[in-house]
């Protein structure tokens, strides 16, 4: 379908977002065209401000509008426990629990030989420097339970073994309320491995 150039550019811009295919991009473009001009300007301003005003924390790598971020600056946090996650959105997910009281380290990716991403391409060197400079007693590896996340966790655990720092991995398994029949083999296997005495 041929669209006027401004609509085509808008559709192309939406398609650059993850999970947005051609049909959704067209829907979003026409939705924006139907919005009030003030709302469109507010939306555009929010995008520009987020890109301009946010950066990565120099300590943990989490996204923030101040450096260091609010978590690294919180004196009530247990600085001796560092939870290593892949992305800033993982920090947000962990914080929703309101149970974890340690600090974080965001890798901003995972090792992926097929994708050409090695340890030096993610935030691992900064993690090692941080662990050398600070009095960390435990590192919790909370990378995703996929091939890349597992490879990253394994790589970090091997790097840290000689340091004497306790390295743990979050448990993986069945979601609460989930049925066994809908779980895949890997999930069931991880659930069995992570079983504990009751």
From Swiss-Prot:
PROSITE patterns from the xrefs?
Answer: RECR, TOPRIM
- What does the UniProt keyword field contain? DNA damage, DNA recombination, DNA repair, Metal-binding, Zinc, Zinc-finger
Give positions of the C4-type zinc fingers: 57-72
Family to which the UniProt record says this protein belongs: Belongs to the RecR family.
GO molecular function terms attached to this record: DNA binding; zinc ion binding
| Identification of the protein by name | Recombination protein RecR
**Primary role:** May play a role in DNA repair. It seems to be involved in an RecBC-independent recombinational process of DNA repair. It may act with RecF and RecO.
* Highest taxon of source: Bacteria
Every copy of the Toprim domain together lies at 80-175
Q: Give yes or no: UniProt keyword DNA repair.
A: yes
Entry's Gene Ontology BP terms: DNA recombination; DNA repair
Q: Is Transport among this UniProt entry's keywords?
A: no
């Amino acid at each position: 379908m041929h669209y006027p150039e401004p609509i085509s550019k808008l559709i192309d811009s939406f398609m650059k977002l993850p999970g947005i295919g051609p049909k959704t991009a067209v829907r979003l473009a026409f939705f924006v065209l139907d919005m009030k001009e003030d709302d469109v300007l507010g939306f555009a301003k929010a995008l520009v401000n987020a890109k301009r005003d946010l950066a990565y924390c120099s300590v943990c790598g989490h996204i923030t509008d101040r450096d260091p971020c609010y978590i690294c600056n919180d004196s009530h946090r247990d600085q001796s426990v560092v939870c290593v996650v892949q992305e800033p959105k993982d920090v947000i997910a962990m914080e929703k629990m309101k149970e974890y009281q340690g600090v974080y380290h965001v890798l901003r990716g995972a090792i992926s030989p097929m994708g050409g991403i090695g340890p030096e391409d993610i935030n691992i060197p900064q993690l090692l420097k941080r662990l050398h400079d600070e009095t960390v007693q435990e590192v919790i590896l909370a990378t995703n339970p996929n091939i890349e996340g597992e490879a990253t966790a394994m790589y970090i655990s091997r790097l840290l073994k000689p340091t004497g720092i306790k390295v743990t991995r979050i448990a993986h398994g069945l979601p609460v309320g989930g049925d066994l029949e809908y779980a895949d083999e890997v999930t069931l296997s991880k659930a069995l491995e992570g079983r504990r005495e009751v």
